[in-house]
């Protein structure tokens, strides 16, 4: 179940690409300040306020983070990318997938990331309502294909290779 631990980096790549390709926002980094000497980008109210689209993004983020008195400057993450997709993507299926991915991060990955705990499909389904296979096959693959990170044929070759590896491991046992 190391897949669950790796969901945040995968989600970042998927959501960045979704913002870039499936919304009018484009590259989120144009609304960021790059931290000197580091490869980190701070999404800032100042940068967002410099264009009409940026102001619309800021409004969506303020609504999302109203519980903490609105959006605050931060190194952007899936927590900021998801509401941008929600506000600017027209594909409801993608928005639903993004919500599931964020839910998996919040209710599954984040609580177990720094503890020693046995994770199985029962625990996963209990916390997020779907199994790891469903999360991977029905959600992550769909977003990756939609943002053209991977073609369906590529997934099929990975699936075929995984089946072959599983068969070989079983033969050795």
Label every model-predicted segment.
Residues 61, 82, 151, 167-170:
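Residue-level marker of intrinsically disordered, low-complexity segments enriched
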Residues 1-81, 163-164:
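Amphipathic alpha-helical interface elements
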Residues 70-86, 105-113, 170-173:
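Long, charged low-complexity terminal regions
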Residues 84-160:
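Charge-enriched, short contiguous segments at helix-coil
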Residues 52, 61, 65, 89, ...:
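Generic secondary-structure transition motif, activating predominantly at the C-termini of alpha-helices
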Residues 159, 163-171:
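Conserved non-transmembrane functional hotspots
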């Amino acid at each position: 179940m190391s897949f669950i631990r790796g969901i945040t980096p995968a989600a970042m790549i998927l959501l960045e690409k979704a913002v870039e390709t499936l919304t009018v926002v484009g590259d989120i980094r144009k609304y960021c300040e790059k931290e000197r000497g580091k490869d980190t980008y701070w999404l800032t109210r100042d940068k967002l306020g410099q264009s009409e689209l940026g102001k619309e993004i800021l409004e969506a983020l303020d609504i999302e983070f109203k519980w903490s008195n609105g959006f605050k400057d931060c190194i952007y993450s899936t927590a900021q990318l998801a509401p941008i997709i929600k506000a600017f993507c027209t594909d409801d299926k993608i928005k639903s997938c993004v919500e599931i991915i964020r839910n998996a991060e919040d209710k599954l990955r984040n609580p177990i990331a720094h503890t020693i705990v046995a994770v199985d499909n029962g625990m996963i389904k209990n916390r997020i309502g779907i199994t790891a296979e469903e999360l991977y096959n029905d959600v992550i693959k769909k977003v990756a294909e939609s943002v053209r990170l991977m073609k369906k044929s590529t997934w099929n070759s990975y699936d075929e290779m995984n089946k072959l590896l599983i068969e070989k491991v079983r033969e050795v046992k």
